[in-house]
Amino acid sequence: MIQMQSHLRVADNSGARRVMCIKVLGGAGRRYASVGDIIVVSIKEAIPTGRVKKGDVRKAVVVRVAKDINRADGSTIRFDSNAAVLINNNGEPIGTRVFGPVPRELRAKNQVKIANMAPEVL
């Protein structure tokens, strides 16, 4: 569960390393975001040669959450940390690679391009 002021790692090669959620998109008063949801983030830490700079405000898709994700078959999955992938205003990833595993719930939330770039889909 990601909410405002939550810090996330960045799981792509866009140049950002850490981001902070400043808004959860998808309805007035929506408080939490989970895997596949789009959030607005502020970049808190970035590498000097990246496509984004510290202080930029961008959109991102949540790809990993530390909170349990319940599946229809009764199983659950959880990750060690919260992570996101930066996207542009058209919904396309800024980076060209995604690091680490992503859950298959991304495909159900129309984030197929990110799921295809990931090395492993759980």
From Swiss-Prot:
Q: Name one GO molecular function term.
A: large ribosomal subunit rRNA binding
Quaternary structure, from the entry? Part of the 50S ribosomal subunit. Forms a cluster with proteins L3 and L19. In the 70S ribosome, L14 and L19 interact and together make contacts with the 16S rRNA in bridges B5 and B8.
Top-rank taxon: Bacteria
Q: Name one Pfam family in it.
A: Ribosomal_L14
The protein's matches in CDD domains, at most eight in alphabetical order, are given as: Ribosomal_uL14 (cd00337)
Q: Does the keyword rRNA-binding apply?
A: yes
Q: Which gene encodes it?
A: rplN
Alphabetical list of PROSITE patterns matching this protein: RIBOSOMAL_L14
Instruction: Please give the function described in this protein's UniProt entry.
Output: Binds to 23S rRNA. Forms part of two intersubunit bridges in the 70S ribosome.
- Sequence intervals crossing the membrane: none
Q: Which organism is it from?
A: Hyphomonas neptunium (strain ATCC 15444)
Matching entries from HAMAP family are given as: Ribosomal_uL14
Concerning InterPro entries, the annotation shows: Ribosomal_uL14, Ribosomal_uL14_bac-type, Ribosomal_uL14_CS, Ribosomal_uL14_sf
Name of the molecule in the record: Large ribosomal subunit protein uL14
Query: What UniProt keywords are attached to this protein's entry?
Result: Ribonucleoprotein, Ribosomal protein, RNA-binding, rRNA-binding
GO CC annotation: cytosolic large ribosomal subunit
Its ancestry begins with: Bacteria, Pseudomonadati, Pseudomonadota, Alphaproteobacteria, Hyphomonadales
Family the entry assigns: Belongs to the universal ribosomal protein uL14 family.
Biological process terms from the Gene Ontology for this record are: translation
